[in-house]
Amino acid sequence: MNAVVRNGCCEIRGGAGKPRVTLPPMNIDEAILHRDHVAVVLRNGYCQLYNTEGKLVTTYSVNDAKFVRFVGDDQLAIHHRNGRVEIHDFTGRLVRVSA
């Protein structure tokens, strides 16, 4: 599977390359797929986590996200525009902050 962002919309594609799910927000800047979760960074700096069925898992309370990456199987690193990195779990709870 892979996540493809085009014109602010994200499609999760299956193994054959056919679209499986289209995520609802229309202003997506970046999408990262890891196992059964997709983390998206919106153009306004917010970050959301979806499962591969397209259901919203959580919205993170940051408004200046530059990009995200997965840490292990159950945590998400949110990189801010000012260089700070926050590690959150999939429930939205802040685990650790790095400067």
Regions found by a protein language model. Give the residues of each.
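Residue-level marker for isolated small/hydroxyl-bearing positions within beta-strands
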Residues: V4-V5, V41, H79
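Loop/turn residues immediately N-terminal
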Residues: N7-E11, N44-C47, N82-V85
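Short loop/turn segments that connect beta-strands within beta-propeller blades
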Residues: G15-A16, N51-E53, D89-T91
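Blade-level signature of beta-propeller repeat domains, shared across WD40, Kelch, NHL, RCC1
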Residues: N82-A99
